[in-house]
Amino acid sequence: MDELENLDDQMALLTGMPESVVVWQIEAMLSAPAGVILSTMALLDNWARGDRAGLNRLLSAEEDPAALAGCPDEAGYTAYMQAMYGDRDTAFARQAADYLDAGTRVFFAVGAAHVLGDGGVADQLAEMGYTVETVGAQGAE
């Protein structure tokens, strides 16, 4: 088994978000717990149906300027999101390409937010010339 990143990498990322943004996110989640549950259920439903467009809509909602309403540090939040998704997606895509180029047969897993979306692992691999097929619980698209 090989890791894409280790616990230290993840902890450094998670503790790198400005504290004011962490508090803002927690308060937002606690003020609308039903919304958190509904968005998680929608994410799972779209994945189960193999609905890539639906997943992209849900995942891109975090980047909507309206989602930043009340954020105490928009620049800090934007930098954190770039580190959380953009930078990691690029690293994951490179690692996947290395496995593919080596002819290594592996089970390669990352979270849905890293696979899909503009600049996600699937897009980056396609841009590198690989054939990318999205598979949900119901099978291939």
What are these model-predicted stretches?
Residues 78-141:
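C-terminal soluble interaction/assembly domains
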